[in-house]
Amino acid sequence: MTAGPGRPATPHTATPHATAPHTAAPRPGGRPRIALVPLDERPACTALPRMVAAVAGADLLLPPAAALPALRRPGDPAALGSWLAATDADAAVVSLETLGHGGLIASRTRPATVASATAAWEPLRALAARGTPVHAVTLVTRTPDSADAMEEPAYWDPHGPDLHRLSAALHRAADGEAGAAAEARDAAGRVPPEVRADFLTRRLRNHAVNLAALELAADGTVRSLVVGADDTAPHGLATAELHWLDRWADWLGLRGRVAVRPGADEACTALVARTLLGLFGGGPVAVRVEAVDPAGLLRTAPYENVPVGTTAARQLEACGATAVAPEGPAPDAVLLVHTPDGAGDWAVAPPAATDPAPAAALAARAARLLDGGHGVAVADCAQPNGADPALVAALAAEGVLERLTSYAGWNTAGNTLGTVAAHTVAAVAARRAGRFDADAHRRLLLHRLLEDWGYMASARGRARAALGSDPARHDRVPADHPVLAAVAADLAACRDRLPGFGGLAVDPRSVVLPWNRTFEVDFALTGGAAAVQATAAVPATAVPATGPAAGARPAEEQE
């Protein structure tokens, strides 16, 4: 029975993790089944974890659409709890914001109390009591530097930028920086008192919910917990709260089970990979993190608050992997990070060109490692909100795209590194268990290349130029707008320029813009293993090392 607000809670009998079995074998002879309550209904939160699960021959189960959120409409926490209780699955991955509030946006916008949000988590205790492994994610509330209120409280237009400045000043003042207290008073004076009060009260409530999530890990209700945040900066209330939560995780002795790191949309995907590793057994996946520019691992990427090397290690930890030293034993895979270069932002300020030298060096390193028998994963963090065309061209020229263990280059460095880590862990765990699905793996690789390089760094710019989108605002595109046909044609052309992946093509009828905006795209790939021999590879030299057409002005800020 599902407990919720106003209903008696299920007695807590979850076994503390220290004495609980680490693995739970999937059903004999069948495909593992993982129940997912996602952050929201976008493909990044639903289709991506499903594709990662498919690499390991696993099925991802989602709640009915009516129970999930739809943009600003909250989902139904009671229905989600009932679905979890009734679903026959080997494990569960749960967004605590969705189960508690009805979705990620709802956690920022709807009125709720700490008591009501945490009461909606009671079904997790029942799952844990019957031995079902539960893995959860909780997110620290963001404070984007934008006047766009599409995903925020209505007062974000026009007060978002001032709230962002207030957030940074409050953090610096708390750290004792000279002049920060005066800056905080000035920033506070620019925001109406009722807006400031609501902003801070919501943060207080959500921080208390984040702390309650740590208690779920401490008492064994959840096997692992990811604490994430998107759109952060070195100074801001989200960064301060992440630091406090990280300290509490340490004080509670939860290091290794609680991962505190930048990133949001990829968090459930990371936990799907960790779940698969637990179901299959075999111990942690060892990954060596490299960069052709080692100093680049010390740079902090845009929209983040820690160096990209730290993000890589923490994302691996979230997936159940371990970052190993270069002088250590041979790893299961080598993660090559294309480090932040400050060249631009594919969503708001796309670079006219990128430096081909580091891209060529990374691709050459990937080829050498592959030829030496190593698994190679590539995380393109050079520019946010899209992939570096020079890197894709260099990887294609080396003939290694289809040989990679994983690849991503989308949105933030945290999103990218979490996706790459998840795909890598799922692939390694599946190979160990004899469950690796080569066709699903190829589909995921190609999907990321086409979305991150083909769309974000190319087709999106042309679509926005045609629409005349305002770069400071989320645009809105009707589902039947002619620009969708142009996007489909662009994606098909990008597919034609990529070597390998024989038999796979973009289905033009499947191309959609989630949330009816150009920030992201979704599409299906047709063909598969049976058609591999029927399609000749396109020459590697066909991939151009260029971005969007001249004059294109991608018009979205980072999520």
Annotate each language-model stretch with its function.
Residues 10-17, 21-26, 535, 539-546:
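Long, intrinsically disordered low-complexity tandem-repeat regions enriched in serine/threonine/proline
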